[in-house]
Amino acid sequence: MSVADVKKGVEQKMQRSIEAFKNDLAKIRTGRAHTGLLDHVQVDYYGSMVPISQVANLTLVDARTIGVQPWEKNMVAKVEKAIREADLGLNPATSGDLIRVPMPALTEERRRELTKVVKSEGETAKVAIRNLRRDANEALKKLVKDKEISEDDERRASDDVQKLTDKHVAEVDKLVQTKEAEIMTV
């Protein structure tokens, strides 16, 4: 294993941490409608649970309403039930074969709770990134111990890993700020 392998590996893992954090943020409901909110809803489709996107077309009707149009008429009731039971605080209404999912307005208290959740998720992501930095630094120390690289190379590589860490932590902070602003916008 070389210094380049360590740096490349840690950067890829940090990027995956950022992607996982973005996915976690997407699950947090803001006052605005977006189809990604229903990505994790599972529907009973002939005995097996499948994501809602595999049995219905998801569209935005307006800024506060998601339209869900199941491809099969017999799925309308099942899809509506799945959305209602998804624990997202949503109350779908069916008109014909279109299910409208209005986004309820968030109360001030609920907005504050959600910003706390966002901050907490952000801290978790930053801890994961710092743990990756620690693992990379340990791998570099092992390379020095095994006499594969010099201490100067290790120090330079450590500085590079620190720069990567700072960059990814700053990205998490930026994502947290953006999501908080989105939540607090009435």
Curated annotation (Swiss-Prot):
Source organism per entry reads: Burkholderia vietnamiensis (strain G4 / LMG 22486) (Burkholderia cepacia (strain R1808))
Per the record, its GO cellular-component terms are: cytosol
Which GO molecular-function terms appear in the entry?
A: ribosomal large subunit binding
CDD domains associated with the record? RRF
Query: Gene symbol?
Result: frr
> Pfam families, alphabetically?
RRF (PF01765)
Family indicated by similarity: Belongs to the RRF family.
This molecule's function is given as:
Responsible for the release of ribosomes from messenger RNA at the termination of protein biosynthesis. May increase the efficiency of translation by recycling ribosomes from one round of translation to another.
Major subcellular site = cytoplasm
Q: Which UniProt keywords apply?
A: Cytoplasm, Protein biosynthesis
Put simply, this protein is called Ribosome-recycling factor
Its annotated compartments are:
Cytoplasm
HAMAP family registered for this protein in UniProt: RRF
GO BP: any one term: cytoplasmic translational termination
Instruction: Indicate yes or no for the key word Protein biosynthesis.
Output: yes
Task: List, alphabetically, the InterPro entries matched.
Answer: Ribosome_recyc_fac, Ribosome_recyc_fac_dom, RRF_sf
